[in-house]
Amino acid sequence: MAEVVVFHSVLGLRPGVLGAAERLRAAGHTVHTPDLFDGEVFDTIDDGMSKEESLGSREIARRTEEAVAGLPAGLVFAGFSMGLVYAEWLTASRPGALGAVLMHGAVPVEGLTEYFGVECWPEGVPVQVHYAADDPWVEAEQEVVPLGDAVRGAGAEFEAYVYPGSGHLFADPDFFEYDRASSETMWERVVAFLDRIDAR
C-alpha cells in the first residue's frame, strides 16, 4: 500500500476531502488528511482565500511541515488547489517522497524556487496532474507544461489529465462545480497511480 498525505483547498477540510480519503483507504492505501485551517470550512472560494491570506503562505507551509513531521519518508503527497502547492513543495523537498498527485492545477519548478527555494525536481519522482480544460485558475502552458518538462527531465513519469468544462473544484461533491463523471474518472486514475507506486 502507498501512504498518502492529502492537503485540502482553501475551502478547508470539508466532507469531500474526507470522503476522498476514505475512497483511497478502501483501495488499500493509508491516508492522512491534515487540517491546515483550525477546523474552519468555507462555502465559497473568496471566503477560503480570505482565510488563506490571513494565515499567510509561510504559516501554512509551517503547518504542512508540522503535519508530516512524524510520518515516514516514503510518502505520496496530494493536494486540492491551494493544497497542491504544498503537496508539490513537500514532494520536491522532503527526502524519500515517492510521488505527487496535483488536483486542479500545478506549479512550475520556478515557482517552487521563488517561494520555497526548491531548485530542481527530484530524480525519479512521478507526478500526476488533473484539471478542467477551461479552468480560469489554471494556466496550463505556464504551469503544467513546464512542470512536466522538469519531471520528465528528472527521469520520472508525468501524467496530465484534462477534463471537460471550467469547474475548478470539480471533484468536491458538496461544491457547485462538482462534475460526477470527471470526478469518478479522476479517482480511478489516482488509485491506479498509487497502485503503480506501491508496486515499485
Identify the residue ranges that each predicted region occupies.
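Conserved alpha/beta-hydrolase "acid-adjacent" motif
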Residues: 136-143
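C-terminal catalytic histidine-bearing segment of alpha/beta-hydrolase fold enzymes
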Residues: 157-200
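Serine-hydrolase catalytic machinery in alpha/beta-hydrolase-like enzymes
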Residues: 1-74, 171
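A conserved short beta-strand
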Residues: 96-108, 126
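Active-site signature of alpha/beta-hydrolase-fold catalytic machinery across serine-
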Residues: 19, 89-93
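Short beta-strand/loop motif that positions the catalytic acidic residue
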Residues: 123, 129-131
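Short beta-strand immediately N-terminal to the catalytic nucleophile in serine-hydrolase-like folds
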Residues: 77-79, 103
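Gly/Ala-rich beta-loop-alpha elbow adjacent to hydrolase catalytic centers
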Residues: 79-83, 87
